[in-house]
Amino acid sequence: MKKNIALVMGGYSGEHDISIASGNQVYNQLDHSKYNVYKIVIDREGWYWERNGEHLPVDRSDFTVNDNGRKVCFDLAFIMVHGNPGENGVLQGYFDMLGIRYTTSGYYTSALTFQKGYCNPVVKSFGLVKVAKSVLLYKEPPTEAKLDELMEGMRYPVFVKPAAGGSSVATTKVKCREQLLSAIREAFTEDRQVLVEEFIPGREFDCGVMQFPRGSKYEGWNPDFKHKLVFPVTEIIPIGGHEFFDYEAKYDGFSNEVCPAEVDDSIAHHIQEVSYRLYDLLGCRGIVRFDYIYNTEEQELYFLEVNTIPGQSAESIVPKQARALGISPAELYEMSIQAALAQ
């Protein structure tokens, strides 16, 4: 019997449209002869099942839909909601209460990794990778008089970003004191907590990791990484005047993404090994991407963030990394489903 898959996309954050693009890519790659796939869209107006342009209601009391008089219960939720409520643990807690399996990390890991100000100290405590100095601000911007106190122990430039968010929305590179307060105010428009983080010069690298189901043909593919696929490392090179991998660089083509990265094998393997270990230490599940800066002067790797629901559009980083291993998007998502169903 075909399993019912809820492909959940959208969300309440500025990443809503990106999530829809990722969700549509996944929808087009799933095996519809094997699964009944339902597009479930979340937005500020409500939750609905999108069927041939119609918006049909979702019963949130038990996460079901009515398909021509037949109540449809779901065997699995394939979560593609970037930001709130998909990456912050809210949907995961909801599905846990309903007993519905899903393709991502659990609620606790999702909540922790989504909040950069809380995740960074935890990652630092593992001793695997360096973490930049930072200050976490709560509820409201500081006064002008407090800026120097805030920057004590840090030096410009700094990044100012929402503590919980993604796709570099409302993220600013601040080069001097005069720019700091306005950047903090902008970040507070996206979140109630804001992170001010010291800029680390260097090369940006990303590495995807995923678990695969037992019995997969990839068992034993690399003796260093048991029971997981650790993808080739990608280097992100902003172009067109972009100083970092901001929203436009990510989605409007203002970056070169080189995979496999043209870097010494020892550095690439170190990035893969750190990603592999962080995946377990943080309790990750599903497809996850880890982002880093390699400071060439210090020859040190710095942790940037974890993406527990990385983008899956045709040009997103993880699908490109998978293709570098000879894994098609269809195979990638099939492995994700099978691993989740086996939980």
PLM region descriptions:
Residues 198, 279-312, 322:
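Conserved metal-phosphate-binding beta-hairpin within the catalytic cores
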Residues 2-9, 13, 71, 112-203, ...:
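Active-site nucleotide/adenylate-binding loops and adjacent lid/helix of ATP-dependent enzymes
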Residues 172-273, 300-302:
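Phosphate-binding site of ATP-dependent enzymes
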Residues 37, 101-102, 130-131, 158, ...:
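Hydrophobic beta-strand scaffold residues
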Residues 1-108, 112-118, 122-125, 138-149:
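ATP-binding N-terminal substructure of ATP-dependent carboxylate-amine bond-forming enzymes
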Residues 83, 168, 307-321:
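Glycine-rich phosphate/pyrophosphate-binding beta-alpha loops
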Residues 257, 261-262, 266-269, 273, ...:
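Peripheral (often C-terminal) accessory segments that flank ATP-dependent C-N-forming ligase machineries
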